Amino acid sequence: MKLTADRYAGASSSLTLDTDALSRYTDLVDLSIGDTDFVTDSRIIEAAARDARAGYTHYGFPQGDPQLIDAIRSSWKEDYNVDISRDEIFISASSCLGMSQLMTAVLNPGDEVIVLAPYFALYRQQIEMAGGVCVEVASYEEEAYALNAERLEKAITPKTRAIILNNPCNPTGAAYTRRDLELLAETARKHDLMLIGDEIYTRYVFEGEFIPMLTLPGIRDRLVTLNSFSKNFMMTGWRVGCIICPPELRKVIQWVNGAQIYTAPSISQRAAIEALAIRRDIEKLYVSRYRERMVYASDRIEKIPYMTIARPRGTFYLFPSIKKTGLSSKAFCAEAVNQAHVLMSPGCAFGACGEGYVRIAATQPMEKLAAAFDRLEQMKF
């Protein structure tokens, strides 16, 4: 008996890591995982526990906790002077699930979605599971991963449905300028395309400022913004995010969600309310530490003879080239585990133009980062 559908023939993870490395090397430094090393702030945990005892342990509202929806609206107004109606917000059980539900809601079979590569490793899977086609538009280290209008235009066909922009970008650390975003908006209007802003690391812009796509004029009718509490608030395990989009699309996403999990976890939504209330403190206490790590890691990479890097402007990821070694991304990562006891993600997992690169997550304390780079400097090829 065949157990799986034909469409999943040959399905495998794009991000293949040496998960046995930790058992082989007790001194392994794991720089592969995009999970913060800080525990969720105690005030958030305590608020969630208090609300759990008060009875927030049942199904919630399908659209999301009304108090959380209003807290999101207030934060957008205070932080970016953007007005958002309640009908435009849907609370998702993570932005990752939200993106999958969005693809299901907007794609017809064969629709093409442009992703700016290197891109978040799950985009292709999310698009293809919804019957779409993932189209990569490359960006390059030599251009500081800036948006290239000519390559973008060439990728657009009559089947193009949407463009996804991850800002700031996992894995490259690129943070896009207002001019980049205006160019993207102009292209979307010209070709009548949907714009999807995957804005997960909004607090992690270390050069310049984070510019939400919602601040651009004249694109609200074609714009979808995904936000998450995972990285900004050290809440990866709580699984809560939100989608901001036109009301008619929000209703369809909510319908899709109803057939899957019905509603995001009530207790996680209560935690998210507290997170927004103390967001200034969170930024001061935690995000500033990542800025220090990113500067340190960039400096160390620039001193390693076989690596080059376009210094990241945001996120907590670095994406150095290892082309000088002559190894593929996967082969280099295997050598790094065996020689240096350092685990990283191969760049090929993030699109074709990621081959020859590795992703480093600065999600370890400074002393472990230092140890990792000390060992990487000693590698022989």
Predicted regions and their residues:
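Conserved N-terminal alpha-helix of the aminotransferase class I/II PLP-enzyme fold
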Residues: 59-92
